[in-house]
Amino acid sequence: MTEKFGIRTLEWSGKTGLLVNGKETLLRGGCIHHDNGVLGACSFADAEERRVRILKSQGFNALRMAHNPASRSLLDACDRIGMYVMDEAFDGWYIPKEYHDYSRDFLSDYKSVLTAMVENDYNHPSVIMYSLGNEVTETAAKRGIELCAEMRDTVHSLDGTRPVTCGINVLLDVYARLGIGVYSDKKEYKREPLPEGKGYKEKKSGSAFFNYWAEKLGKLFFVLSDTRLAEKAVRDISPALDIVGLNYASSRYDKDAEKYPDRLMIGTETMSADLPYNWNRVLRHKQLIGDFVWSAWDYIGETCMGWTYQSYKGLPLLSGQGMIDITGLPLAQMAFLRTVWGTETEPFLAVRPLNHSGETPSKGAWQFTNALDSWTWHGFEGKPTVAEVYTTADSVRLELNDKVIGTKKVRQNKALFSVKYAPGTLAAIALDRSENETGRTRLISGEKAPILTVRPDRSVLPPDGQALCFVEIEFTDKNGVLLPYMEQRVDIKIDGNAVTLQGFGSALTKTDEVFIHPYHNTYRGRALAVFRAGKADGKSTVTVSSENTEPVSFSIEVTGRKEE
């Protein structure tokens, strides 16, 4: 048996922060679920490799597994590519969040689960931290705090080289102490389906309870995490952890850093809109070692947490608020993160979709924009939209076809402009305090005639039954400029048995379409198809077609012969 491993050192303290190989390291983190979009819940090595590479290219240097231990394929990819990992054991402890959830077996199984996670992670240098759970209200009670300390000690007995944290939702803990938002069973639990038509529970609890009230309260819950009750909740659980993980409680950072100089903190779950405030505190306080935004990559479930339009009539399918959508496309919010982190040096320019001009979206709390970096909206001339510029500059000037639309001060790394669509060039010019140009970016309208553009990420696969070919499918003009208003059916035909279609879909949040059919509508001009190698040598020809465009064909070869 051959086992790969890595060697590196970890140190952590309130005075030094987190040190990796003796160097202070700030975690530019994102939370990810285990699913792989159009592939569903399956973990393929090629899918994890692609996902981690895209995340790394966008500036992330750390991932939090939400909310279960990572697959070996994902950890292998993180080891190779260089991505830190906070591996998380549980989404809940012994208090149910749903009727038929793991809480029913937690007390009998948690030690074996922790042991399995640590033994799986031990030789993976990418894993730098363990998390015991997510938004578990047990941490508000004495029994839960004692259990947390016991689990921490269990992990330390298996691996004393990595710190232990837990994602504490302070506001949920405050409510739990008041008996609010906690799941309760009035009858004995039965391991059988409830009668047809009967709900498992009538009231939201746990994370679902928090998500509901986060939408209602908005910025108010930021304030509620900084009360005396909240202070007590954090104070009591802190000794049971090496690093205190705080979910949506950045209002505590300044006071806790001053009052508890030896207490390490990490933003285990935050909103992207809050990053200017949060990252400023990460840079200011040694004890605050990083920030993990929700979520780095979009996922199936917890539907419609972003911006959605009523004109899409399908069933809710995706969360719809990820910094990167399920096809692997980085969105405007991702550019905002790069700007705040300082990894993006030029201003970023995006506009809200003109094919929905006049519609009012339902705005989820976890997404602050649905803008995209395109100025190609044929058929929507004269329609109003909002242009958004993300930058570290003092102010921004917006120009359309060399005419000044306006100049605005930058607030929280953003400047917004009202503008009406006209084909041509939309430009954002970043200015310093003396109004000297420090950078610029522009969006140029594409031509009207659509073509299908198909981009396979590889043309040769090994015959292992696991290798994947990812194919981006877009409606563009002849120069490759995306036509984001093109939302129509695309069909896929495969000739030859070398590969099969493993998944095909778009990033549309609400849809009645599924990922297993050889046809799907594009969303924002785009879809993703994934082909899986068989176990025998051969070649397949794939043809992609759509109405009013020329079909496009390409080949995928499956062979055991290595490419030269």
Where are these regions (language model features)?
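Active-site-adjacent substrate/metal-binding segments within catalytic domains
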Residues: M1-E150, G160, V164-T165, A240
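Edge beta-strands of extracellular beta-sandwich domains
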Residues: T2-F5, E435-E447, E550-T559
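Short aromatic-acidic-glycine turn motif
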Residues: E11, I451-T453, K493-K510, K562-E564
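Short, hydrophobic beta-strand segments
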Residues: L416-Y421, H517-K535
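Short, solvent-exposed loop/turn segments enriched in Ser/Thr/Gly
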Residues: G465-V471, G538
